Amino acid sequence: MSPNELTYLAILLGSAPLGFLFKNGSPQVKQRGSAAVGVALTLITCHIHSLHSAITILGTWLIIKILPRSCHFPTLGWTFTYLLFFRTITYFDIPAPTPFTNAVQLLLTLKLVSLANEVQDFYRAKKQEVTSFSKPSAISTIPSIPSLREMFYYSYCYIGLMTGPFYRYKTYYDWLHQIDPASIPSWKPLVSRLKPAPVFGVLFLIASQYFPLDYVKTDEFYEQAFLYRLFYMVPTFFIFRMRFYVAWIFAECGCISAAFGAYPVSAKSRSGGGPTVEYAPLERNAEGAKVELEYDYETIKNIDCYGADFCVKVKDGMRYWNMSVQWWLAQYIYKNSPVKSLVFGSAWTMLVSAYWHGIHPGYYMSFLTIPLCLAAEGSMEAGLRRHVSDSGKMIFDWVHWFLKMRAYDYMCMGFVLLTFTDTYRYWQSIYFSVHVLAISLFLLGRVLALKSPRRPRNTKEEKAEAKQENRLQE
């Protein structure tokens, strides 16, 4: 492991026990203490480059002060423009920021854009309250506009500061003002969530020794047989997954120990977004005694390891990976896509996601392969799967799962190789196999759809899939 990876690991390992110290604290202790820890971590790891995050916060605060009722898109433009300056800073003879500064800046960008949207929603709710004489739902609306100091507290809260998960200001506010946090379980959920992490960590260390990424950049690698080159992307993506599985599980444990993002199960919370229905934070029975509620941590869940590995479709794989960020992308980017189409909307979203990750060409080459895979999936679903028997659907789904994993293996190479030259060289050495296969399957699906008899639209299965699609995008 590199020194930076060891530093990340130390931060993650320290966040879990630290959470227990803050769990039962007063709102002031939680607010100021968590921010103090976050500021200390930022200064220690980012040094003078900590100014980048401070400037971004100040700029966002000014936008909210000047344009409180329409601050979402200006904030999106401001934070993403600053990201471009941040990534190209060396061209201005300014020292390059540390990797930790980049991590802070990435998460901060998401939080500030979300905060601006929450401010807009606050004013919209107030207007609705005045015009309709009805009180709007409070489950997702912030109670007041945060001051500059409160914005700094939220932005530098040590929870999720560098590794995620992303969370909204309302989630943070609810944590500060939790009712009876001592009754919210932390230890058992933490142990349960932590169980697979050691296995993933050992697998990561072992696989990294036998399949180093740097080997792909050598001439010797390209002298190997085609099948070996093709196979190498499988362990590369495996190593990539194990590393992030460990990091995100530990990051979630840091939230769980502090009871951060804990809501009653009845709230039907979603990763990133929080509760989706009205819920009672405290319930009493007929005798007036407090009813013990069942809680979950879905709001801060950032990875579904089983879902990511064993879901059938490429589009489902995205939902199970970096889940809080996927919610942010769906909520603030996909829904505002200039073209209302799954493929074009996904392409727009993936372009923004690539830009958010960085300016390395490998990001764009990888992310912009996803819409092609989605188009192939949709084409084969329409042209073949819906016309076969139940046993045929099962076979189709197993083949689909295998190809989905190979598609992610292929795209991962661009994500880790980063440069255009290295990514293109590797993809060329395996004859752009996934691109060729995706285009072929897209065309095949179209041909099969033309030859197959038309089925009545809106069958029960299609309605169920559409309902699930809408639910996941809300």
Curated annotation (Swiss-Prot):
Compartments in which it is found: Endoplasmic reticulum membrane
Origin species: Xenopus laevis (African clawed frog)
Gene field: mboat7
Name recorded for this polypeptide: Membrane-bound acylglycerophosphatidylinositol O-acyltransferase mboat7
Pfam families in alphabetical order: MBOAT (PF03062)
A single GO cellular-component term on record: membrane
Any coiled-coil regions, as ranges: none
Residue spans, topological domain Cytoplasmic: 1-5, 58-73, 212-230, 449-473
Function (record text): Acyltransferase which catalyzes the transfer of an acyl group from an acyl-CoA to a lysophosphatidylinositol (1-acylglycerophosphatidylinositol or LPI) leading to the production of a phosphatidylinositol (1,2-diacyl-sn-glycero-3-phosphoinositol or PI) and participates in the reacylation step of the phospholipid remodeling pathway also known as the Lands cycle. Prefers arachidonoyl-CoA as the acyl donor, thus contributing to the regulation of free levels arachidonic acid in cell.
Origin superkingdom: Eukaryota
Glycosylation sites: N322
InterPro entries referenced in this protein's UniProt entry, alphabetically: LPLAT_7/PORCN-like, MBOAT_fam
